[in-house]
Design a protein with these regions (language model features):
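Amphipathic alpha-helical packing elements
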Residues: 56-99
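Polar/charged low-complexity regulatory segments
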Residues: 1-57, 105
Length: 105
């Protein structure tokens, strides 16, 4: 499912053109940062965008232990978060609202 989201983004948003940019993992927000009381969300958002764009470096894993804790705590599947990130790519507040809603479900 995660690969399907990435493939769909690649074909529909990137028109089949690979990005030449690679995320610098040292620029990711700290692991203990939170927004609206949701730990890891500030870090998760740029990771998901980089995953969608094919810009994650080999040393950075989408779905690592911290990501899995985030997904479990907020009742979200990893592929579902990618699709929501895509839907709200230019509206981070709406993505935060979506996570907040999922957290309560």
């Amino acid at each position: 499912l995660v690969s399907d989201a990435r493939r769909d983004y690649f074909l529909n948003q990137q028109n089949g053109q690979a990005s030449t940019h690679i995320l610098d993992s040292s620029t990711l927000p700290a692991k203990d940062l939170e927004v609206r009381g949701i730990v890891w969300l500030p870090r998760m958002m740029p990771k998901a965008i980089a995953k969608l764009r094919g810009e994650l470096p080999p040393e950075t894993m989408y779905g690592c232990g911290g990501d899995r804790r985030f997904f479990k705590a907020n009742n979200i599947h990893p592929a579902e978060f990618l699709r929501a990130t895509w839907a709200y790519e230019d509206e981070p507040e709406k993505l935060i609202d979506w996570v907040t809603t999922r957290r309560g479900s």
